[in-house]
Each structure stands twice: as C-alpha cells, then as structure tokens.
C-alpha cells in the first residue's frame, strides 16, 4: 500500500486547488502513469522548458513542477516503449506484457536520465501506476529528506521528527537520505538506495534548517540554541554590563529556542564575571556583604515576553492582498514589562524578507 501526503505551501504559482501537489500524468498504461510531489525549486526552469520545446513537446505552463513531471514522464515513456517493443517482438502475448514491463522497469536509470540538467534544491517523491515508488534528493543536499525502513513499512518525510512521532521510534532509527541519492521501491517491496548523480559540495538551506524545521528535532534544537548563544559577545558589548536595565525578548515564535540559547550564554558570561570579581576581592581582602549582594543578586540577564503572536495566524504564507490586514492585529505587546529607562534587546529570527505591511505594524 502506498500513501502520500504533502503539507508544504507554494512559493510561487497560483493559490488554487489545481496548483496543489501531487501532480498527475495519466495514461491507460500503468507503467506510464506518473505522480510527482515534493519540496523543490528549480533555478533553470526556462532552460528546462526550452529543452522540452526543442524535443518537440509543448509545455503549457512555465512552472518547475510541470518541468519535473514532464521530464520524468518523458524518460518513463521512453523506457516503457523500449521494453514494450522488445517484449512484443519476442512474441509475448499482449496481456502478459504490462506485468513484464513492470518487473523490468529501471527507476534508477529513468531518474538518472531525467535529472541530468536539473539545477536547484529538491526533495522529490513520486509513484508510477504499477506501484513503483521513488524519492530523490538534490546533489547539494539543499532540501532536507529523511527516511525510516522497518520490517513492516518504509516512510519518507522532509523532517526527522514527524517520522519519530508517528512511528514512535528513536532519532537513531531515522536516517537522512544522502545528497544525490534516491530511494527506490519496487511494487514487490524490494528497495534500494543508490546515487542517481554525482554528489556536490554540501549546501543545506538555512531557511529549511533554522527557520522552517520543527524546533523539537534534537539536532535543530541544539543548532538554534547555539545560534542564540553565538550572539552573546555582541550583546555584552552593546549593553556594557547594564543587565539590570535591560530586557531580553524574541520575535517571532520560532526564535524562542535561540532566545533560550542567548539567555544561557549571557548567564554563563555573568557567572564567570561574578566568579572573577569574587576571587579578586577575596585575594585583596575587600570581600564584604555589600559586594556579595551587588555581585550575586544584581545585574543578571532578565528575560521578558514582549511580543505576543497568535500561533494559528501565519502571516508569511498569507497572500499579499490580505497580509496587511492580518499583520495589523496578529501581534500584541505586554504592557508595563519594559520601563522608559530600560534597553530592549529583541532576538529576531526572521530569515525571510520583511514586507511593507510588517514594517507598518
């Protein structure tokens, strides 16, 4: 049984039902029927469409989704036709030919031929009408892709955590599909992971890894905390040790983990500073109760929840025509948490562009 689900939003194209994945290429031959879905952006879509035109095809749309679907479909047709003619000419009865084609169809070769000219980041999944399945990842590893293989099932997802949660497994059981590799599964359940092209220099997308990924992934969580902690020296220099008159906060919600990392980094800095001050006073004989109170009880980093955002409201994926209205009321502030003499330090993890409606808000 093959099940698929696609929850990614479109980065281009139209906001209508017809633009949703998966895309289908139907025929009355199971081994020529194709379904494609995934997380990808091709950087050379015009060139790929021109290649189809020079081949004699007539692309109806200029999207990379159509390009991927039609390119794989073309090489699938070629492989199917070659097998059909060979089997027909060998004298095999017509009703037996579809099953023979299905068993002989080489998914790896089809994908290898299809992806020769692709340039971009992609994690693409697809299925053929006979029950064969494939999943491939770009040679730079720009888009994330993970898989889980057990005795009962094979599952694939962009991120590690959904597989861990749904199938109740440990993180070590979920593997990352290497760049330039594909997972192919035949209809009979046999499967393989093979290279379909040459791996290139690793270049994972920071948007995918830091902003868009689920924050409860163990690796992503550590990376986000480290990202916040790395800001510690800059914050210390800008505040000049005035922690008692500073409030640390974050925006948007995805910045929360990095915010914890920043607070942790600032507290480690403060502990080291206090330790050094106390040691120096102890050696000089100037350690007294007032100094202990000043060093231990005062000037520690203070965190505040300043910006409140309705987590159900996604301004980033809202269409431009309604974004201004949504942004104007999706955020609110905590009143009275910051005084007129306080310095507000806001950790902003927005890796996307700030639209004009956001600036106005």
What label would you give each PLM region?
Residues 14, 264-344:
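Short, glycine/charge-rich flexible loops or terminal/linker lids adjacent to PRPP-binding catalytic cores
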Residues 232, 236-240, 253, 263-271, ...:
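Hydrophobic alpha-helix feature that most strongly marks membrane-spanning transmembrane helices
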Residues 57, 61, 65-90, 259-288, ...:
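Internal, charge-rich low-complexity segments
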Residues 3-178, 184-247, 251-252, 337-340:
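Conserved short alpha-helical segments that host acidic/polar catalytic motifs at enzyme active sites
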Residues 52, 140-142, 150-152, 262-269, ...:
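Short secondary-structure boundary/capping segments
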Residues 135-138, 146-147, 256-263, 355:
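A short acidic (Asp/Glu
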Residues 255, 343-349:
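C-terminal substrate/ligand-recognition segments
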Residues 2-5, 349-360:
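Residue-level detector of conserved catalytic or cofactor/ligand-binding positions
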């Amino acid at each position: 049984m093959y099940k698929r689900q696609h929850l990614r939003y479109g980065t281009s194209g139209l906001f209508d039902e017809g633009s949703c994945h998966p895309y289908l290429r139907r025929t009355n031959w199971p081994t020529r029927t194709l379904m494609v879905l995934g997380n990808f952006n091709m950087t050379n879509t015009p060139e790929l469409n021109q290649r189809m035109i020079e081949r004699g095809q007539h692309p109806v749309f200029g999207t990379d989704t159509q390009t991927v679907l039609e390119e794989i479909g073309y090489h699938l047709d070629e492989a199917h036709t070659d097998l059909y003619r060979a089997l027909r000419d060998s004298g095999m009865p017509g009703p037996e030919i579809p099953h023979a084609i299905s068993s002989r169809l080489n998914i790896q070769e089809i994908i290898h031929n299809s992806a020769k000219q692709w340039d971009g980041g992609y994690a693409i999944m697809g299925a053929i009408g006979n029950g064969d399945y494939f999943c491939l990842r770009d040679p730079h590893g720009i888009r994330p892709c993970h898989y889980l293989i057990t005795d009962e099932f094979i599952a694939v997802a962009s991120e590690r955590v959904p597989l861990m949660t749904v199938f109740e497994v440990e993180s070590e059981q979920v593997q990352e599909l290497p760049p330039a590799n594909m997972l192919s599964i035949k209809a009979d359940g046999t499967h393989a992971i093979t290279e379909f092209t040459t791996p290139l220099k690793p270049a994972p997308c920071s948007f995918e890894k830091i902003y868009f990924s689920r924050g409860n992934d163990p690796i992503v969580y550590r990376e986000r905390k480290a990202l916040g902690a790395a800001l510690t020296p800059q914050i210390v220099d800008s505040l000049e040790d005035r922690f008692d008159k500073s409030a640390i906060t974050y925006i948007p919600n995805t910045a929360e983990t990095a915010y914890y990392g920043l607070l942790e980094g600032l507290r480690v800095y403060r502990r080291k500073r206090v330790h050094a001050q106390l040691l120096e006073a102890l050696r000089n004989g100037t350690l007294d109760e007032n100094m202990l109170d000043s060093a231990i009880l005062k000037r520690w980093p203070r965190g505040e929840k300043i910006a409140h955002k309705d987590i159900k409201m996604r301004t980033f994926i809202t269409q431009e025509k309604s974004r201004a209205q949504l942004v104007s009321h999706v955020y609110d502030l905590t009143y009275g948490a910051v005084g007129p003499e306080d310095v507000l330090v806001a950790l902003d993890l927005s890796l996307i562009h700030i639209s004009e409606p956001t600036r106005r808000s």
